[in-house]
Each structure stands twice: as structure tokens, then as C-alpha cells.
């Protein structure tokens, strides 16, 4: 019987195994940022330890960094975390892309950009959206601060082997439907707990037609489906993306690596513990209306009603979400006004995301009641976008063009949504207070966010696509 890619990678990385106990896994790449690492480095210091493999560790600053008025950091906690990471990286010999460095950016954007992320690797970071790197055919997952210290000390991690799940996206996407819509549709259909206890492989025609950046969006939000990690088997699109990048193998070594990477793809007769199927043709642009990512529906739809649910706990959850979001039962999604638009985050801040949004925005103006910002995912992405003139398109339309960072995805820096106001956001979480105390978050794709910025309320971006054809 054949193996799926999850089994292939996991089995290759087991250092020690004992029946009834977690496996000890070797970790190929440890990504570090300023928020979850200070206590881990302090633990090393207190116990007289060093980083075992600084060459397999890479650090950057992203969560707390300001995206305007650089280099000022007003919050003392944020400033301390950034300064502490710089000191720790220097003391322990870890490479750092700090503020002002040409490689700086959101950790889950720069890993792939730099060629650090490669198929077959085990990748960890003290951040839940480490699953992003699974787009390359890697087992990548977030860890806690104590685990960060363990990896720094030993380059290994104790882990229970998860079950395996295939989520197959059959068919082809319709025009105007984005990768973000695929993953939001999956979560809306199967729920935020569907992946609990599993590593998920995304398969199917619709998945393998996606670019690498689009695949990253899919895997980024596998954690919102409850999964330990999500990944996609590598193919020629994967190989072509990695070729020539800064930390990728070069020359003959690259060709050898590429052959190995392609061999990792799940065998034709591979099996999974669970299989779920969704049809791409049924997916339309999605808008979340509630306070978790499963509370979403197609743009042509409406907010659910209590009558749509039989279970009393589901009715209570709906009512709680409606109260927080300030929405009415049965309200059409296109009737929801917004005050903010955020295009950015580790989910949707790459070049293809910015181009897609700019295509909608070009020649149009941001609605007078909307404050809109674009935050590229890395310094490199920002420079490339500026070379293509995307910054001018956004600025001319009325967007603010910012420096790279996590920004408005989470209320951990200067970019927050005021209480009671709504944001059409390309980020990954719409929990209560995620973008600021009392803020109301609606998750959408970059084109949908751009269209909402123009209209001042949610609209079907496919109407804009028709206008430009």
C-alpha cells in the first residue's frame, strides 16, 4: 500500500519512537519572531545552554513593528520585545532580518520568499499560522514558547502523530473566485473543528491549478479548520517557485533536491483516515458575517436566521454573534456597510494578492466613509510592488501604502479598528476584539476587500470583473 505525503515526511523525521508515547521529531527549520521567543531564550540563558543549530534557525520582527512613522515604536512592551529579539539573536548566533533589513517581513511570507521553506521539511514557529509553509509539501505547525525553547536546545520536539485527512477540491473555480474563498468555503461547509487531531492534505484539480502564493493562503488557514497542519504535495509549480531563491540549493544540488521533492507527492494508492470533498464550481466569493471563520457564506447570500438552526446551542451561538457584530437575522451580506479595509497579513499580502486587489481598484476611488490600508507582507514584496507601480494605483485610489508587518491582523501594534466599526479584512481570524476592542471583522479575499473599499459596503467583485473584461 502506498503512502501519503504526511506519512512520508513524518516517518523520515522520527528520531526516537516508543509504543504508546509521542514521537521525537527532528526539526529542519525553526522560524522565530519577537513575541513568543523572549522567554525561550531566557530559559537557555538560565540553564547555560546554547542554540543547538543556529544554522537551522531564522528570526524576524513582524507582529509589533509599526507600518508607518518608522522607526518609532510607542508601546513600551512592543519596543522591549523587538529590542530583546535583536539582543538574543546576536548573543545566540541566530540570523535576524530585523527592522530595516531587506529581508524583513512577516515570518510566513519571508520564509518562502527566501527559499528557506522547502518540500519535505519539518518546520516550526511560535505562531499558529506556521501551517502556511505546508503549501510547499512540508509538515509545518505552530508551537508554544516552552516548545520554542526545546527546539532551540535540541532541534527536536515530542509530538503525537496526528491522523491524516484528505480535503479534495474537485473541478475548476469560477471567474472572480479566489484561493481565500476556497478555504473559507471549506471551513464554512465542514466547520472549525473538522481538522482537529489531523494533518490535512489539500488535493484536487482546483488546488493544483493554484500558484504557490495561492496555495499558501489555503494552508495558512488550515489551522482555522482545527487542523494541526495543512499541506499540498509538491509539483513542478513548487519546484519552479523555489528555483534561484536565496537559501535554496543551487546548480546540481537543486536538481537533486527537486527530484527528491517531487518523490514526496502522495502515492496514487495512498489512503487517509478521513476524506472530505468539496466542488470548486459551487464556491462563490465568501464573506464571514460572524465571530469565527466558519460563520461565512457566499456574497449572494444573507446572514442566517434562528429558524435555520435546530440545535439550541447553535441558535445561542448565532444570537451571540449577531449581537456582537450588530447584524440582523436574514440581512443580505451586500447591505453591510464597512468603515475600514485591510489588505495584508500572512494570509493575503503577497504579490499576487496585491495585483488582484489593484486590478479592482485601478481607476476607481475609495468610498468617502472608508479608511483603507495596504500592508505588503515583506520589504521585498513592497519594493517589487512599487517597481510595478501598484503603490501608485492604491495611493491614487485613496489607500494608505504602508511598510511591511502583521499590522491590522491583530491588535498588537498601532493599526487597530475602533470599537463598533467594521473592517473588510484579508486576514485569517474574525474573533471578538481580534482587530481591536469591540472591532467587527469580516474576512474576505483581496479582490472582495478592494471592491468593498470602493462601494463602502460589500459587493460581488464578479460585477467588477465583468466591467473590466
Swiss-Prot record:
Pathways per UniProt: Amino-acid biosynthesis; L-leucine biosynthesis; L-leucine from 3-methyl-2-oxobutanoate: step 2/4
Source organism superkingdom: Bacteria
Keywords tagged on the record: 4Fe-4S, Amino-acid biosynthesis, Branched-chain amino acid biosynthesis, Iron, Iron-sulfur, Leucine biosynthesis, Lyase, Metal-binding
Cofactor: [4Fe-4S] cluster
Keyword flag Membrane: no
Listed CDD domains: IPMI
UniProt cofactor note: Binds 1 [4Fe-4S] cluster per subunit.
Binding-site list for [4Fe-4S] cluster: 346, 406, 409
Catalyses which reaction(s): (2R,3S)-3-isopropylmalate = (2S)-2-isopropylmalate
Family matches, as InterPro entries: 3-IsopropMal_deHydase_lsu, Acnase/IPM_dHydase_lsu_aba_1/3, Acoase/IPM_deHydtase_lsu_aba, Aconitase_4Fe-4S_BS, Aconitase_4Fe-4S_dom, IPM_dehydratase_rel_enz, IPMI_cat
Family: Belongs to the aconitase/IPM isomerase family. LeuC type 1 subfamily.
Subunit structure: Heterodimer of LeuC and LeuD.
Biological function: Catalyzes the isomerization between 2-isopropylmalate and 3-isopropylmalate, via the formation of 2-isopropylmaleate.
Name of the molecule in the record: 3-isopropylmalate dehydratase large subunit
Originating species: Lysinibacillus sphaericus (strain C3-41)
Amino acid at each position: 500500500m502506498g503512502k501519503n505525503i504526511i506519512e512520508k515526511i513524518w516517518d523520515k523525521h522520527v528520531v526516537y519512537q516508543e509504543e504508546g508515547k509521542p514521537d521525537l521529531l527532528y526539526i529542519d527549520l525553526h522560524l522565530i519572531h519577537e513575541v513568543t521567543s523572549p522567554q525561550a531564550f531566557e530559559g537557555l540563558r538560565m540553564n547555560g545552554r546554547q542554540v543547538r543549530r543556529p544554522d537551522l534557525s531564522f528570526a524576524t520582527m513582524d507582529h509589533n513593528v509599526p507600518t508607518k512613522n518608522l522607526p518609532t515604536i510607542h508601546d513600551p512592551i512592543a519596543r522591549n520585545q523587538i529590542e530583546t529579539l535583536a539582543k538574543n539573536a546576536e548573543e545566540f548566533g541566530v540570523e535576524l532580518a530585523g527592522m530595516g533589513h531587506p529581508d524583513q517581513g512577516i515570518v510566513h511570507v519571508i520564509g518562502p520568499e527566501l527559499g528557506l521553506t522547502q518540500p519535505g521539511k519539518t518546520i516550526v514557529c511560535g505562531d499558529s499560522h506556521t501551517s502556511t509553509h505546508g503549501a510547499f509539501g512540508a509538515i509545518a505547525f505552530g508551537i508554544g514558547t516552552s516548545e520554542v525553547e526545546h527546539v532551540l536546545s535540541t532541534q527536536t520536539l515530542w509530538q503525537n502523530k496526528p491522523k491524516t485527512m484528505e480535503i479534495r477540491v474537485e473541478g475548476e473555480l469560477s471567474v472572480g473566485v479566489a484561493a481565500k474563498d476556497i478555504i473559507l468555503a471549506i471551513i464554512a461547509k465542514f466547520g472549525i473543528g473538522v481538522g482537529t487531531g489531523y494533518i490535512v492534505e489539500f488535493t484536487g484539480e482546483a488546488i493544483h491549478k493554484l500558484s504557490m502564493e495561492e496555495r499558501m493562503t489555503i494552508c495558512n488557514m488550515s489551522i482555522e479548520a482545527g487542523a494541526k497542519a495543512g499541506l499540498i504535495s509538491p509539483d513542478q509549480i513548487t519546484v519552479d517557485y523555489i528555483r534561484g531563491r536565496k537559501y535554496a540549493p543551487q546548480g546540481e544540488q537543486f536538481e537533486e533536491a527537486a527530484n527528491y521533492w517531487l518523490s514526496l507527492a502522495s502515492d496514487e494508492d495512498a489512503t487517509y483516515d478521513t476524506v472530505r470533498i468539496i466542488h470548486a464550481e459551487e464556491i462563490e466569493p465568501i464573506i464571514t458575517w460572524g465571530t469565527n471563520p466558519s460563520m461565512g457564506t457566499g456574497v449572494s447570500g444573507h446572514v442566517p436566521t434562528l429558524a435555520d438552526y435546530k440545535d439550541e446551542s447553535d441558535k445561542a451561538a448565532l444570537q451571540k454573534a449577531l449581537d456582537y457584530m450588530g447584524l440582523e437575522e436574514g440581512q443580505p451580506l451586500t447591505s453591510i456597510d464597512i468603515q475600514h479595509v485591510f489588505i495584508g497579513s500572512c494570509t493575503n499580502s503577497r504579490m499576487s494578492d496585491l495585483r488582484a486587489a489593484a486590478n479592482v481598484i485601478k481607476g476607481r476611488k475609495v468610498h468617502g466613509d472608508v479608511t483603507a490600508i495596504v500592508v505588503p507582507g515583506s520589504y521585498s514584496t513592497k519594493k517589487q510592488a512599487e517597481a510595478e507601480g501598484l503603490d501608485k494605483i492604491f495611493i491614487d485610489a485613496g489607500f494608505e501604502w504602508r511598510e511591511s508587518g502583521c499590522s491590522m491582523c491583530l491588535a498588537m501594534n498601532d493599526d487597530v479598528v475602533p470599537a463598533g466599526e467594521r473592517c473588510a479584512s484579508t486576514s485569517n481570524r474574525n474573533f471578538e476584539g481580534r482587530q481591536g476592542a469591540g472591532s467587527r471583522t469580516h474576512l474576505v479575499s483581496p479582490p472582495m476587500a478592494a471592491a468593498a473599499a470602493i462601494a463602502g459596503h460589500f459587493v460581488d467583485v464578479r460585477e467588477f470583473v465583468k466591467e473590466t473584461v
